[in-house]
Structure formats: C-alpha cells, structure tokens
C-alpha cells in the first residue's frame, strides 16, 4: 500500500510539473517575433487564449491528474469543453495571420520544457484547434513554407 501511495504521489508530482509549463498564466511575447498587430491581438485575447493552454494540457495529460491539480490549486473542476469554448472565442476574434503567429509562439515557448512525446501530441492538438472551433482552413507561413491548419 505504501508503494502505491508513493508511486501515485510521484506520478502526480510529475504531472504537476509538466502541466505547469503547459498552463502558464501568460505568454512570453518577448522571445517571439510576432508582428505588433498580432502582439496586440494576443495581449487583448490573453485571458481566453490561456484556456487554449488548459485545453491542450488536459488533453495531453491524463485528465485525472489535471482534475486533481485543479482541485489542489482551488480552481474547482472545469471541463475540457469549457476551456475549448473559451479558446474558440479568442481564435474566432483574431485574424488568421495572428492565430498562426500565436500557434507558432505556443510551440516555441514549450520547446525544451516538456518531453518530445508530449510536445508532438501538443502540436497535433494545437493544429486541430481551428477545426474544433469551426474555423475554416487557415494558411500559415513558417520558415518560407506555407502550410494549412
């Protein structure tokens, strides 16, 4: 029984550490090369965009750990759907170009913070957000290449 408690605690601590990086309550806009127009849009929509972080964190981490973290931190239990709705509000209010820049910033901010497997899953989830929000296909430009989200 003691071993189970130790393993459960260790797993929760690992999940808490990983989720912390995915759920930063703000965006580090200083390290990214975002246009001033998009920087303004991201700052204006930041409270809703943070919900995108939470949605992705809940999706890539085991929901049980995320729920436990929410309760420990006094946030109550909020559903993935609630975070997705808030995220969609922000993405629909922003110009496509700025959504693309924000998504790139999200990926850049997580590099080196989380493991490669979680990073790949997070990127996949991030690319699926526009579709989940009912936003038509977007053209994004990165490193001289065009790609569709």
Swiss-Prot record:
Residues 1-22 form the signal peptide. Expressed in seeds (at protein level). Expressed in seeds. Residues 108-117, 132-141 are annotated as: IgE-binding. It comes from the Eukaryota. Changing residue 52 to G: 21% inhibitory efficiency in a competitive IgE inhibition ELISA. Keywords: Allergen, Disulfide bond, IgE-binding protein, Seed storage protein, Signal, Storage protein. SUPFAM superfamilies: Bifunctional inhibitor/lipid-transfer protein/seed storage 2S albumin. Residues 41-53, 68-81, 84-95, 97-105, 121-131 are annotated as: No IgE-binding. GO terms for molecular function: IgE binding; nutrient reservoir activity. Disulfide bonds join 38-98, 52-87, 88-133, 100-140. Belongs to the 2S seed storage albumins family. Seed storage protein. This is 2S seed storage albumin protein. It comes from Fagopyrum tataricum. The lineage of its organism: Eukaryota, Viridiplantae, Streptophyta, Embryophyta, Tracheophyta.
